[in-house]
Amino acid sequence: MKLSVVIVSYNVKYYLEQCLLSLRRALRGIPAAIWIVDNNSHDNTPAYIAARFPEANIIVNNANLGFARANNIAIKQARGEYLLLLNPDTIVPEDTLARCIRFMDNRPDAGACGVAMLKDDGSFAYESRRGLPTPFTAFCKISGLCALFPRSRLFGRYYLRYLNKNKINRIDVVSGAFCFLRRSAIDKVGLLDEDFFMYGEDIDLSFRLLNAGYKNFYLPLRILHYKGESTQKSSARYLHVFYNAMLIFFNKHYRARFPLLAPIVRTAVTARALLDFCSQKNKRLKLKNKHKKNWLFIGQRETFILARQLLSDNATDLDFVEASEKNLPHGHLDLSRKLNRYDCVVYDTDAFSYKRILLIMAHEHGVNRLRLGTFSPLSGRLVTMDRVY
């Protein structure tokens, strides 16, 4: 066994289905196993996935055990030279895993590697590579200095934006959304710390890998990450869990060295959480006022007919371009029509490879980027970040 893929799922069965469809292509020719740990979903995820993906090993928990604990359950049972911890709200292109394996095979000093995560508008997610949140780095993030001077090697350590995103780089923290790990390294440093319910466990694991003498890397390979579709990222609960993880990390690794900073860190983290909650609430109000639904579908005619039927009751105008990546290699970017009338482009995944779709989206330019939707004839579902049809 070369690779075991571990996915923790909670009430996202259609996003998980899309992820698994992409994995079927990405795992061709690789001796691999897929482990799905369901954290007591209420949307019938285990039965739905088992009927469509008999090759997957499914573990069903009777409660939401959190991300770290659920991953550990599968890691203990999984076999393979490598482990991939993967979020269910992702799309993995066809050659990504083979290239990760090739890199890790050639770098025995590598403990983990991450990739370039794209948002649904094709923009680069800064969480793809991060520095360790030392007290100073965390201060720069919380105070806004990191945002003011993003490319500064002093103030911008949190997101490492001074590094070239198109080149392989050594980094500190590999994101838990796509964390490609050497199994022997995990056996050496231990499993995910279950004190972290969700968020922060990837930082802690990356830190322990570095302390054990391994190196962590960023590879310029694209995946799509809807960024937490299974969580309400603007909710008070999300912000509490996210910022509490920062406190857990500080208390575990830095409090003994900087005891006087503890009350300052707690106050700063609490204040930042409140600011973010207010900011996210305002964003939600703005999104509710957005009614534009003009979409562009690119793919096969018979597939378009199926997709249009899904949208018939959703007040969505769906224009059609019959094409494939062979005759329209740059997708909507090759079209002469004005694209600013659309806010979403839907690609037929039978007519375009996942790799090609993400390549096209990554080359989007301008402020008004189109958001991505995908339609798979195999699932009969049209998937966007906001909704599944």
Region spans (language model):
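Short, flexible, basic/aromatic active-site loop/helix in glycosyltransferases
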Residues: L132-I171
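A conserved acidic beta->alpha catalytic loop
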Residues: S22, D38-A47, A63
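Glycine-rich, basic loop-to-helix element that forms the pyrophosphate-binding segment
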Residues: V60-A78, R99
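A short, conserved alpha-helix in the catalytic core of glycosyltransferases
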Residues: N164-N166, D172-R222, I360-A362
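Short, well-formed alpha-helical segments that are part of the catalytic scaffolds
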Residues: V12-L27, H332-L333
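Short aromatic/hydrophobic "clamp" motif used to bind/position activated sugar donors
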Residues: L83
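Active-site-adjacent helix/loop segment of glycosyltransferases
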Residues: F207-N282
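Conserved donor NDP-sugar-binding/catalytic core segment of glycosyltransferases
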Residues: I91-E127
